[in-house]
Amino acid sequence: MKEAGRFAKVSVRLYLNDGYSAPEMPEENDIDFGSAEYRRMLEASLVNLGDTKRLEKALCKARAGQDVTIAFIGGSITQGAGAIPINTECYAYKTYKAFCGMFGDGDNIHYIKAGVGGTPSELGMIRYERDVLRNFTVQPDIVVVEFAVNDAGDETNGVCYESLVRKILMSENEPAVVLLFSVFSDDYNLEERLRPVGFNYKLPMVSVKECVVPQFYDAARRIITKNQYFYDCFHPTNAGHKVMADCLGTLFEKVDIKAQKALETAGGDLKEALKAIGDTAFDNESAAPHYGNSFEKVELFDRQNLPTMDIVWNFDMGGFNRIDDELQCVEMDMDIETTPEFPYNWKHDRSGR
């Protein structure tokens, strides 16, 4: 009987036909995650600290024992592709667990993972309310946005990505936004397009590319090889997911120094510490977009939420009177079981009825 989460190991032996040869695979050293050189790699990932006030407030709340929710939205890497098992070895879960470890037993820290393989920020900005906010029942304190390798087909050239970022920044509870730039095995990502968005809003930015790619080509300083980092040409191995989590952890460590100082100066009074950190409101009117903000107020309408909206709808669905149940499914949060995407849809009835 098949059981979710159970894995087996197999040995695969490849043979070459006569007359063919293959280069000998060099022996790889164990990854020294505790070395000073590894620490320098992680430091290189912090391409911009920006204005960390929102993040400081979230860390202060966590240190004070208040409930704090950390959310992740992105593509297949955020979903956990390459990680085995996908729900507990992915970078998002590893980051969450490290975050819990920074703040006592972590019972006050909550986790949302909303990665969908093969999807860009064009879809991310539409599903944010459902997959991250859970139809406005959740207010995350920190949102990590990871679309640096998914947006190549974005016809708006950054407008969708920036619209998603602005949508999060405009949230009433003022969550911290962290931009995370993952990388493919050919060293490709779109961070040169996306960095200006982060600089425009003074956001913390973490580049996995800056962390791992330079050392791939420096034999004297190499800590992890491409073969060790990548599961395939797109996704990280368990070790690669750990590197990504450690990059984010390095950011949190640096900002936590400020958070601890704010709490100490306030004598442990959380309210006073938050007040001292300063205003973090997002002024939508004065914050000019870098690429554009055409979609910052876009909303998802489907069979579930359409009837609840304070709008009078009068239209004929025509042939779209069925529901499609053959949907892409993903592992949300800590689940090993999958959840269908966009289940409350309209499907065309080809019979014409």
Question: Which residues make up each language-model segment?
Answer:
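N-terminal secretory targeting modules
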Residues: 1-73, 78-86, 104-108, 138, ...
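Alpha-helical cap/lid subdomain in secreted, periplasmic
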Residues: 5, 15-19, 63-66, 90-110, ...
